[in-house]
Curated annotation (Swiss-Prot):
Catalytic activity: beta-D-fructose 2,6-bisphosphate + H2O = beta-D-fructose 6-phosphate + phosphate; beta-D-fructose 6-phosphate + ATP = beta-D-fructose 2,6-bisphosphate + ADP + H(+)
Annotated tissue distribution: Liver.
Family the UniProt entry places it in: In the C-terminal section; belongs to the phosphoglycerate mutase family.
Name of this protein: 6-phosphofructo-2-kinase/fructose-2,6-bisphosphatase 1
Its job: Synthesis and degradation of fructose 2,6-bisphosphate.
Gene Ontology MF annotations: 6-phosphofructo-2-kinase activity; ATP binding; fructose-2,6-bisphosphate 2-phosphatase activity
Residue numbers of Phosphoserine PTMs: 33, 141
Organism field: Bos taurus (Bovine)
One Pfam assignment: His_Phos_1
Regulation: Phosphorylation at Ser-33 inhibits the kinase and activates the bisphosphatase.
Taxonomic placement: Eukaryota, Metazoa, Chordata, Craniata, Vertebrata
Amino acid sequence: MSQEMGELTQTRLQKIWIPHNNGNSRLQRRRGSSIPQFTNSPTMVIMVGLPARGKTYISTKLTRYLNWIGTPTKVFNLGQYRREAVSYKNYEFFLPDNMEALLIRKQCALAALKDVHSYLSHEEGRVAVFDATNTTRERRSLILQFAKEHGYKVFFIESICNDPDVIAENIRQVKLGSPDYIDCDREKVLEDFLKRIECYEVNYQPLDDELDSHLSYIKIFDVGTRYMVNRVQDHIQSRTVYYLMNIHVTPRSIYLCRHGESELNLRGRIGGDSGLSARGKQYAYALANFIQSQGISSLKVGTSHMKRTIQTAEALGLPYEQWKALNEIDAGVCEEMTYEEIQEHYPEEFALRDQDKYRYRYPKGESYEDLVQRLEPVIMELERQENVLVICHQAVMRCLLAYFLDKSSDELPYLKCPLHTVLKLTPVAYGCKVESIYLNVEAVNTHREKPENVDITREPEEALDTVPAHY
């Protein structure tokens, strides 16, 4: 490599990060997470509220979000511990005077707390979400004492809902499919679960504005119509509050797609800001016809600032917003190069990217990890919106898809997001339903799988083995 080319590459100092394990490989010495961890002590997020108040929904979404931004988080659902300990018969298990059941429930809570300790203290977890009713001051005091003994921070999330229609809808969507009610009559399930709620109501002690004024918490009233926040103490708690104040449960669909095929796509070059190819323009009109056929009410459309997404959106004949955060990943010195040219001029960089595609940062460019941080405001906007179409780019779409489908950082850079295909995401109880719609306009394949040999000393043909044909 020439001296001129060498100067383009980042310095060793800029590439160093703390390895995820104790390995001594050259890559591990150069690896680094550009995103700092904002918690100096592990955090326990404690759910509070009666059954059918959306606690598990909140727990699942919050965990997905925190993992996506790079904070290792895990849900500990007490219902799962209880089902492993004893089979469910009916609501009588939850009667406040059922002493045998009370003992079992406490033992389950202690078992879950033991697993929380293992996760936060021995498995590099940063946030544990304790998903249970935790409706009594006695139970919350037990948790607070546990957290104090182990040096964990505590943040409470209480979900309060008195709207019978919302409660009934939650029971219909979630509880009818619960493992507690397999093969049970629908009406009997509803009757039993309402009686279960009554059992909890007897001893329910909500967080108190005066008695609990020293605690950190957020109260969510009637699925987000009102909030009360108290003593937010650190960055993670602040981000949690911000996130929870943006999510909603209104039925909607999120449409994700890439721009139409571009001129640089045809030439096998990454990045750049070229316009659409002839087939790309054909796709733009096919997309317009598809969106019209969906009959979507109040559709909001977002694009990046790049020509190829704007040209794709123009064909829709709808208003659209340009979001700079949706711009494609910055390939730095590799912008508008083919994979063959990157291998020729920067073989070491090409290998390092294959070794850790999520954290690798292009010289003078970005990593997928950087891109996730850039896209966080987009996620907040998507959570706030109802029906929305996002016309973006391959790396950007992978990051957004990883959030909605709860994919790991290892899976994220290899998610398949082909050209001329729309992904329709419909949020459901604890996840997303995905429909893939190919609009029948041919395009080049831009998906490159991870090659078998990722060593720096590999032969060029091994490095280029998985490069797709661009014709």
